[in-house]
Amino acid sequence: MFQIFRGSPALSEFRLNQLSARFQKADLPVKSCYAEYLHFADLSAGLSAEETDELEQLLHYGPTLAQHESKGECFVVIPRVGTISSWSSKATDIAHNCGLDKVVRLERGIAYYFEFERTLSAEQQQRLVSHIHDRMMETVVRAPEQAAVLFDSQDPKPFTTVDILNGGRKALEIANVELGLALASDEMDYLVENFTALGRNPNDIELYMFAQANSEHCRHKIFNADWVIDGEKQEKSLFKMIKNTFEKTPDHVLSAYKDNAAVMEGSKVGRFFADQDGQYRYHNEDAHILMKVETHNHPTAISPFPGAATGSGGEIRDEGATGRGAKPKAGLVGFSVSNLVIPGFEQPWENELSKPSRISSALDIMIEGPLGGAAFNNEFGRPALLGYFRTYEEKVNSFAGEEVRGYHKPIMLAGGIGNIRAEHVQKGEIPVGAKLIVLGGPAMNIGLGGGAASSMTSGKSKEDLDFASVQRDNPEMERRCQEVIDRCWQMGEGNPIAFIHDVGAGGLSNAMPELVHDGGRGGKFELRNILCDERGMSPLEIWCNESQERYVLAVAPENLAVFEELCQRERAPYAIIGEATEEEHLTLHDNHFDNNPIDLPMSLLLGKTPKMTRDVKSTQVNNSPVDQTNIELKEAFHRVLRLPVVAEKTFLITIGDRTVTGMVARDQMVGPWQIPVSDVAVTTAALDTYHGEAMSIGERAPVALLDFAASARLAVAESITNIAATNIGDIKRIKLSANWMSAAGHEGEDAGLYEAVKAVGEELCPALGLTVPVGKDSMSMKTTWSENGEQKTVTAPLSLVISAFARVEDVRKTVTPQLRTDKGETALLLIDLGEGKNRLGATALAQVYKQLGDKPADVVNVELLKGFYNAMQTLVQQGKLLAYHDRSDGGLIVTLAEMAFAGNCGIRAEISALGDNDLGILFSEELGAVIQVRESDLAAVREVLTQHGLIHLTKDLGLVTEYDEFEIKRGTKVVLSEKRSELRGIWAELTHQMQRLRDNPECADQEFAAKKDPANQGFSAHLTYDINEDVAAPYIATGKKPRIAVLREQGVNSHVEMGAAFDRAGFEAIDVHMSDLHTARQNLKDFNALVACGGFSYGDVLGAGGGWAKSVLFNTALRDQFQAFFEREDTLALGVCNGCQMISTLADIIPGTENWPRFVRNTSERFEARAALVRINESNSVWFQGMAGSHMPIAVSHGEGRVEFKNDSQLQGLRDQGLIIAQYVDNNIRPTEVYPANPNGSVDGITALSNTNGRVAIMMPHPERVFRTVSNSWHPEDWSEDGAWMRLFRNARVFFK
């Protein structure tokens, strides 16, 4: 039964204005446009009046927007037919958890109503439709009733065979094209030979499985190939040269090259998690460090948001599936694209070169892709702390002559770190008879052939196969799966997981064979046991689809009951689909058709397939130096500040949660002005320690257009000069991930790849003592297409991205680029590892003048690089550095500018001692760093530099001033003189333009104005209480511990740090899942307090916190239980972020909350992750006693934090009752509604509220993430261990005496 429910308006006024502007630009005669949500319900039976009312209440969410009459021509945008959106999965979950069992499935669309000035032609209709939907993910129908097609059910399809016994190799060649298998010629020979020997034809599913498992993407054939270069056989494969780094420096590596991620030694710390009895405790143990970096380039080119989202999701699964289960912790992302060509902001170096229609533009990729990557990390609950962004697209003379080099096929980088227990680093044994399980969501007909598709040059596959390889993200599902994995590894030796892999490229067709093969087993499987949301799928589609958020596991039969219980508690779907066998044979049975779609020996699938030989020739490049004739320094500087690789990247950073876990010690944003210039990301190893982990990135791809090896060396070296800013110690503690992107087969590129790998694996890394225990390759970085009968090609430069990871001794010693003006007399020093060469080839300067140059920067002296690292480590350890920033993209002038921006100060630099060529001195990208030291420490610093052989490379640069100036002189001659604030504005223009396109332009304008304001005072803190006083200490001393329910729903992700804050305040913190209350495993009557935690319950579907709250309100027993708890006079309750939204929705059952608002989408219409300044008001709130009059920063991470009242009298009522506990304030400590000081646009800056009795508080910011000083992005230097917000938790303990 199909039913339609009208929803609220879908687009705000500024979104409608943006859409109208696009129509106008496209010359479409649109007179008016209105859009509203439509909800479609697939019902097993008709709903009663009460059920209909409940469902309508569920489907009422979002901000109140102006409603219009639905008139004009209707176009309804729905999910692509044959797919199920992640919104649908979550909304359906909510309906079921609210008791609406007749709902089979919910889906959502947007109905657009247009009035036109004249009738549209068919071509105009097509253009109109292209502006309102994403063809890769959505379909347009002309009437709401036509959306019923979403729920059409078909009979299962059988497998097909390819007749090679009669048709021979030719039959396989046809299947290779039609199925998009990307099989090589020798692989086709191998398959024909082996199936002929078996005496049968292959089934389509078997061929598909073989193609995925043996694709370049999965098998890394080029990195394992034999090489002949210029007729000379090479001694080693690429992979052997990478492995050489481990052979030379195995120190501190616990696992390399054999698992989903590499593992190195970590620190012994108190890991905080809930035991099996539910109580949170510290566990003193080794927290070893795992690391992984992936790329997801092809899917991001085709459909940027889901491509980047599932890129991050897949890498997170790699971490969680390491060993016998691990914990992902912090992430990084990166993007390389062609020129942006932002309308109205076109730059002199940008030409609007063409692209094929099947791929997204660079601008679209950088609008949608980062949102996808951030959204997945946010919803999963992993802070994204590091990244890079490069644009390149230019016709240059390189190794293949003059041609266009660029990133039409983008790089989308996703990586991170995690932690793992010592006993779980290695996989276990898979016993015969072990249950083979898929953990996670159902199979869907999406993401088919991703492994093979990503191994092809863009443009070589059929366009319908590009559609098939688009994936769908559901991070909230992955979070549920991770919670199960966490419960498993937290059981220590009792961990029920024997073996685990993630499901990625190739789906189960790759994951399950890999699982049993790695365990030395075979497997018998039942196809119809696989959870499947689409009945009509064929065996190939069920087995080979790449539905995300899935893991495959082996669990011994005796441990199965424990595992199932954990899954049920976390509401994580799972299916037992097979058993491990002694014989290494793979059988897949299909109950529906009673046949075997797969019946193969494992040796055929994963055995000795033909080994590749690369017989290639090297080429030379012959270029001219950068022509400096018409380059004026000021203009050059302004251009470079606007180049994306240099420009401020706030638009890529504040969309990503950077505080979740409460263990982030250094994110991108630096200092009181929160400038995104940090060289390194740093986390604490646990919530009770200053030991930690660090990550950095190094990448210099354009250099490869001149010198392959130099580009690779610079990438490694830059990762070291970046990570040197924190307290690591021995360089052997640093481990690298190498991600290689190349257009294999393109003239000169193969030999260049070999040269680059050799430079890293055989030479530089062994010399430095560095190991590369993990990495990834993407060998098809080329886009070809035909345009007006002409063949076009855009080829990416060889691109090596190095990610460096290390254990940190003391996270507090990390040095930032923020120049200090409050430390007395100081000096600026340049340590020039380029030894004065100042080469300009392949620099930002060359790029902005459409040049390439001849000689690029390079590692001049390996020993000096090592000495530099050791010297910086000594100075970091001794606390001698006030500021540190490496020289990289843009050169010395950018290094100095970014340091001045971070310090909101002036610079007077003197460059006479650095050489004769101003452009070379200021814009060369040679290795090095600028440091700021106290005059009183100068002698000691020079002594350390002398000891490490660097004193002859150390140059005095000049002074830091308190003025709004940026001056560079050569003797008495002024080379450049500008206002720092004006340069700050130029540097911010890219972010401003991107935010105006993507977000609310009014918010973008407000933030841009704040950045340029020379009077901006930055953050400050003033506390009216003693930060070091533990007001709860006398009550903790009694030994009594009030019990607090740390409440979470599926998708909540901030519960562990919340438990830690209450544990420190003297509570017995208990992990309580909503499923515990539903099943009566727990009851709120047994608790003194409850806290509803932050995150993304149900992925914020049906309104943030709304689904969670309504699962209480629509369940009589739960509603009564919560109401009784709130009405008791001996209880406290706190709601933070998602918990704030949830508890505000429960206002009807909480005394004294009649004036509470609901929380709706931020004014920016963007997830906002920032440090924000708040002021505490006088109130009767138990939680905020003694804090009134204080102001201090706090972590903010939400997309729906704006208060919305039913009427003005509610707001006035809150004011009159004194229930507004805290407000966002500007840097002058005035309550504000101006963005971004007020990140969500709430009236009066409202951000925390109390009920009338003071026992219930709700707040959107996250005090639990900053209860330790070290986890604040900025804090006054006199704060010690406890942060300012620890007082809130201790106040709660005082209440219970």
From Swiss-Prot:
Reactions this protein catalyses: N(2)-formyl-N(1)-(5-phospho-beta-D-ribosyl)glycinamide + L-glutamine + ATP + H2O = 2-formamido-N(1)-(5-O-phospho-beta-D-ribosyl)acetamidine + L-glutamate + ADP + phosphate + H(+)
EC annotation from Swiss-Prot or TrEMBL: 6.3.5.3
Binding-site residues, ATP: 307-318, 888
Protein's UniProt keywords contain Disulfide bond: no
Cellular localisation: Cytoplasm
Residues that hold Mg(2+) according to the record: 679, 718, 722, 886
Top EC class of this enzyme: ligase
Any one cellular-component term (Gene Ontology): cytoplasm
Keywords: ATP-binding, Cytoplasm, Glutamine amidotransferase, Ligase, Magnesium, Metal-binding, Nucleotide-binding, Purine biosynthesis
Pathway: Purine metabolism; IMP biosynthesis via de novo pathway; 5-amino-1-(5-phospho-D-ribosyl)imidazole from N(2)-formyl-N(1)-(5-phospho-D-ribosyl)glycinamide: step 1/2
Alphabetized GO MF terms: ATP binding; metal ion binding; phosphoribosylformylglycinamidine synthase activity
All copies of domain Glutamine amidotransferase type-1, residue ranges: 1044-1297
Quaternary state and interactors: Monomer.
HAMAP family, A to Z: PurL_1 (MF_00419)
Family assignment from sequence similarity: In the N-terminal section; belongs to the FGAMS family.
Free-text function comment from the UniProt entry: Phosphoribosylformylglycinamidine synthase involved in the purines biosynthetic pathway. Catalyzes the ATP-dependent conversion of formylglycinamide ribonucleotide (FGAR) and glutamine to yield formylglycinamidine ribonucleotide (FGAM) and glutamate.
Name the UniProt record assigns to this protein: Phosphoribosylformylglycinamidine synthase
Source organism of the structure: Mannheimia succiniciproducens (strain KCTC 0769BP / MBEL55E)
Lineage: Bacteria, Pseudomonadati, Pseudomonadota, Gammaproteobacteria, Pasteurellales
